[in-house]
Amino acid sequence: MSADDRTLLTRAATGDGGALEALMSRYAARVYRLAYGITRNAPDAEEVVQDVFLQIVNKGAGFEGRAALASWIYRITTNVSLNKRRGKRRELETSLDELLPTFLPDGHRAGERSFVVADWSATPDRELLSGESRRLLEAAIDRLPEHYRAVLVLRDVEELSNEEVAQIVGDTVAAVKTRLHRARMALREQLTRHLGAGA
């Protein structure tokens, strides 16, 4: 952690509004982006930002500096976001097993296969940029179980390393890699089913 970050954190913890404002200008956008990625709801993400910075003020004096300040803030954000989502439970999450492809004992894919060979290459830019595809992706992320969603957002949206994600979610790197792989597989399956059906 930089000396400047430590100074700002110490001052914010003692009630210095200017220091808190400086920390917010550095980290609020990242906190919001992560919170929105997990809660999938703008008002909830805004509440998470407020709660995170309140915790930073309340717990800042106890921060030991063993991790980078950004990692500590990401961990607080992840925990607050997951708690917010658990408290709401407005949307039902889907079991990951329901989202992944199924295979027969001989190794072939079970079920409808016409969408597997759908050709998306004709218009990849248009398909990726369309609002419908964005909404489809967001809906697919919404259906992921929360611990898969958190890892996916931290790794693929926030572009943190597997080691950083593991530290933030309090798990091993191997577990993070497994969750990330399963989350990506589930997203791929959902997108393939939808986009392949229209081909």
Task: Identify the meaning behind each predicted range.
Residues 1-30, 37, 116-126, 139-142, ...:
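N-terminal module of bacterial RNA polymerase sigma factors
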Residues 3, 135-175:
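Helix-turn-helix DNA-binding module
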Residues 11, 93-103, 108-111, 136-139, ...:
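C-terminal edge and immediately downstream basic/flexible tail or linker adjoining helix-turn-helix-like DNA-binding
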Residues 13-22, 32-51, 150, 173, ...:
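Short, charged helix-capping/linker segments at alpha-helix termini
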Residues 13-14, 40-41, 51-68, 86-89:
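Sigma70-family region 2
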Residues 47-54, 67-79:
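Structural recognition of an alpha-helix C-terminal capping motif at a helix-to-coil junction
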Residues 61-65, 78-96, 102-106, 130, ...:
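Arg/Lys-rich amphipathic alpha helix in sigma70-family domain 2
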Residues 64-65, 86-89, 144, 149, ...:
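Short, Lys/Arg-enriched C-terminal cap helix and immediately downstream tail that follows
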